[in-house]
Regions:
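Composition- and surface-driven signal marking solvent-exposed, interaction-prone regions
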Residues: 99-101, 154-156, 163-171, 255-256, ...
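Non-catalytic, conformational "gating/processing" segments within enzyme and secreted inhibitor domains
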Residues: 1-159, 176-264
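C-terminal soluble interaction/assembly domains
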Residues: 239, 245-298
């Protein structure tokens, strides 16, 4: 099989922890091997807490300590899982062609003074950055050394309205159409972290059958005649990103917890001084690795 892989500079990991006595189908194991997943047989029935601690440790190692405790310590409530499927991403990039320089504190979007950094490409030998500066939105593409990944900063004039109407197609158009030459960028240092269940979000997006013991169909994963059916009990997601004058470090992880059904249920100058959206994506394919927004960089 041939599946798309993360671009140069992005480290990805995939692992599946499967209940030791669960009759997993050969086709599913083949699929796991196809995507390069580590397959671990564990006994959730005997020591579910120990197994989940091991999973969290694996996630922490793969994200270089950026995502800790992906699956909460007080989980599960009730019946133990019979499979946990985890994927991780890690990125550590240095700015190119020049590092930013810290320039002190200034106002940001009405939240008060925050620490700013600046990049100037004034020399004729310096390559320019791409961007778009308009009354509605400011977009700039920031580059990293030795990687296919770029950071796109999107600062709309009306942040709330822009986010409420944002779609993948609208975002793709924003970061793909960059006609202006950018010779300087001033933006805040920022750090953002997220960790919680995304089950409600997925269900709001229409992913419902997989969470339903009555409707879930994982017959391609396990021999349901011998073992019974499975359903997804919860999905946990954790992400961390930090941007400073040296570059960007980011990590993310997603854990899918599966339970048995028998269980209970011109030279532009850009200043980023208002709330903005950030995207880490492959420059060629526009595959998005990290996306988020910053309202307060502190």
């Amino acid at each position: 099989c041939a599946l798309p892989r993360a671009g140069r500079g992005v480290e990805e990991g995939v692992a599946a922890w499967l209940q030791a006595d669960m009759p997993v189908t050969d086709s599913y194991l083949s699929r796991l091997r196809c995507i390069g997943a580590e397959v671990r047989k564990v006994d959730f029935k005997r020591d579910v807490k120990g197994a989940l601690r091991h999973i969290n440790k694996w996630v922490e190692e793969r994200t270089r300590g950026l995502v800790k405790g992906l699956i909460p310590e007080d989980y599960p409530v009730g019946w133990e899982p019979h499979a946990v499927l985890v994927s991780t991403l890690f990125f550590n990039g240095s700015w190119w062609p020049e590092r930013f320089v810290r320039v002190g504190k200034a106002e940001f979007g009405g939240v008060g003074p925050v620490e700013y950094m600046s990049l100037s490409l004034g020399s004729c030998s310096d390559p320019s950055l791409r961007g778009r500066v308009s009354d509605d939105v400011v977009v700039v593409e920031l580059l990293f050394r030795d990687t296919d990944v770029a950071m796109y900063i999107v600062m709309p004039a009306d942040f709330r309205r822009y986010v409420e109407t944002l779609t993948y197609e609208k975002l793709l158009d924003a970061v793909s159409t960059l006609p202006d030459e950018v010779v300087s960028v001033k933006m805040p240092l920022f750090k953002a972290e997220f960790k919680q269940s995304i089950k409600p979000l997925l269900m709001d997006m229409g992913v419902t059958d997989a969470f339903s013991p009555e409707k879930a169909d994982f017959s391609q994963m396990v021999d349901v005649k011998k073992y019974g059916g499975l359903y997804i009990d919860d999905v946990f997601h954790g992400a961390f990103i930090k941007a400073d004058e040296n570059g960007v470090v980011a990590g993310a992880a997603t854990g899918v917890v599966v339970k048995p059904i028998c269980a209970k249920t011109g030279g532009r100058h850009v200043v980023i001084d208002k709330p903005f959206i950030f995207v880490l994506a492959d420059r060629s394919t526009k595959t998005i690795y990290f996306i988020g927004h910053v309202v307060d960089p502190r």
